[in-house]
Regions:
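Acidic/polar, glycine-enriched structural segments that form the non-catalytic walls/loops
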Residues: 2-372
């Protein structure tokens, strides 16, 4: 008999909460589980719940519904009716990377000294929130807070609010906002049938790339399915500290690096906006134009307006779907046995069209009895 050792996370670091999935400590052995549990998506665009710094990851992925690559299916023996072509969802441009350097010391979770750590999937707001108090090797304390969202209102949009405050001393900061294409997979086990197909060559091929001020646009296309993808990022930095920025981009990489002379107690707010557009027919010029139109609108709105729209969407969702969260039953609706809003001590009658009652009558059984 095969025995498997079950990994049990420490309960104090993963406390139960009504509205949040909480992580109170960094545990590398649970990276894969947390990336899945803390993922954000809106049905079109999805981002696994890895850290903003780009790692460490079990399988860092940003995915788009319907963006796939085709490949031949090879069988040991061929037969009539066997599928010849397979389709695999491919990882797209990772635009959520934000790296932090304090006096040239990188913030990297496996080697960092966090004095406090809190990361949570906020089910009321539809965001992934994180707050870390980091002490650098030089003893400088840095408060890092971030909030990530994938918009439910505009399916092409995602955004990150990344905030840094030095508490006890000044320092030279670099906040590097990056986007990367065709990153190698971190942990792919070729013998695991649950894993996605491994492509040996390039999947996304460069079509167009350019930068405008703090905005970078990268356009790629799959080789065989000929689906086109455009990813654009733009930024807004707010701080009273002296700062400058530098933009670098290539076929598969984009970077906007902000250099800040941070003072203690002076907050630094970076808003990063990401836009994804795909098409099976539009060319690179048209798709880049669409991404720019969307980005212009998003930048004008700002992160707070995106967040407010997200919170309103989630509030409407919970009110409509959950009777206990403010949903008011219509006058003609009768309480159901499984309806937590109904009175369990009072008898009730089902609507005339109740499918469960019809099935019971056809089977010669009694209809629902009143709850006693």
């Amino acid at each position: 008999m095969i025995h498997h050792e079950r990994l049990r996370p420490p309960s104090q670091d993963y406390p139960a909460d009504e509205w949040n999935v909480i992580e109170k400590g960094f545990h590398p052995e649970f990276l894969a589980q947390l990336e899945t549990m803390l993922a954000l998506g809106n049905g079109y665009l999805g981002m696994r719940g890895g850290p903003e710094e780009g790692g460490p990851n079990a399988e860092n992925s940003t995915l788009i519904n319907g963006l796939y690559e085709t490949s031949p299916i090879v069988y040991p023996e061929d037969a009539y009716g066997f599928a010849k072509i397979g389709q695999t969802i491919v990882r797209v441009t990772d635009g959520k990377i934000v790296k932090l350097f304090v006096d040239d010391e990188p913030f990297w979770l496996p080697s960092a000294n966090p004095l406090s750590y809190d990361r949570r999937l906020n089910l009321k707001c539809g965001t992934l929130d994180r707050e870390i108090l980091w002490e650098t090797p030089a003893g400088k304390q840095v408060l890092i807070t971030s909030r990530r969202l994938v918009s439910f209102v505009d399916r092409h949009v995602a955004a990150i609010s990344y905030n840094v405050t030095l508490l006890n001393a000044g320092a030279s900061l670099v906040i590097s906002s990056e986007m990367a294409v065709n990153e190698p997979s971190a942990n792919i086990n070729a013998d695991d049938p649950r894993q996605t197909r491994i492509f040996t060559g390039r999947v996304l091929h460069h079509q167009k790339s350019y930068a405008k001020d703090r905005r970078i646009v990268l356009c790629h296309a799959t080789e065989k399915s000929r689906l086109t993808l455009t990813c654009a990022t733009d930024h807004a930095l707010e701080t009273s500290c002296a700062h400058a920025y530098k933009v670098v981009h290539s076929e598969d990489f984009g970077q906007v690096a902000f250099s800040v002379e941070a003072q203690p107690g002076c907050p630094i707010h970076l808003s990063k906006f990401m836009v994804y557009h795909t098409s099976p027919t539009a060319g690179s010029e048209e798709l880049c134009g669409r991404a720019e139109w969307t980005m212009d609108r998003v930048v004008d709105q700002g992160f707070q307006q995106l967040l407010s729209a997200q919170e309103q969407y989630m509030d409407d969702f919970w009110r409509q779907r959950c009777p206990g969260q403010g949903y008011q039953r219509r006058p003609h609706e009768a309480p159901h046995r499984r309806d937590p809003g109904g009175d369990p001590l009072q008898p009730f009658s089902h609507p005339a069209g109740c499918g469960a009652c019809r099935r019971r009558r056809r089977a010669g059984e009694r209809s629902h009895r009143p709850s006693l």
